[in-house]
Amino acid sequence: MILLAKTETKIQSSAQEAYQLLVNMERFGEWFPDVITIKSVNELAHGEVGKTYLETVSIPLIGNRKIKLRVAEAIRNQRIVTEGNLIPILPRMDIFIAELNEHEILVKWSMFSRSPNKLVQLLLLPSVKRLMQQRADIASVRLKQLLEQ
């Protein structure tokens, strides 16, 4: 996997409160830029492995694209991993929540590409990295504001 972007943010919140927000991908657009819509497409609970969503996201020079997201891993109050079917990037989002003390957490957010294609890695991913890091930086500020309000 190729790292596209990452952030680490200290937030005045409990791990449980943060997890409840983060695991509900229908709320992803509240804090992550350029998410137009995101909706559940199966009856599994948020955070359950196999839970699936359909996300509409804005992509520069392309417009809006629909991406199918699936919860690949989840550990209650600690970690959420989703994988998307956006070809050729094949994104994987990994969110880790660490309790620093009773009232403060550290949220580590990372986005990876699962693409094995060397041309994609060489030609496309450098620009995707810049875009995703910009979005991630905005998202970390928004997430902090949302959880601390």
Describe the function of each predicted region:
Residues 1-44, 48:
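Hydrophobic ligand-binding cavity/cleft-lining segments
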Residues 2-8, 52, 66, 79, ...:
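Intrinsic-disorder/low-complexity, polar/charged segments enriched in Ser/Thr/Lys/Arg/Asp/Glu/Gln
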Residues 8-12, 39, 56, 70, ...:
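Generic structural detector for well-ordered beta-strands
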Residues 11-13, 59-61, 73, 113-115:
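Beta-strand elements of well-folded, non-transmembrane domains
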Residues 17-22, 28, 53, 71, ...:
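Hydrophobic pocket/interface hotspot
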Residues 31, 74-75, 100:
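A short, compositionally biased micro-patch
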Residues 40-89, 138-149:
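Glycine-rich portal/gate segments that line the openings of hydrophobic small-molecule binding cavities
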Residues 83-134:
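Beta-strand/loop substructures that line and gate deep hydrophobic ligand-binding cavities in soluble
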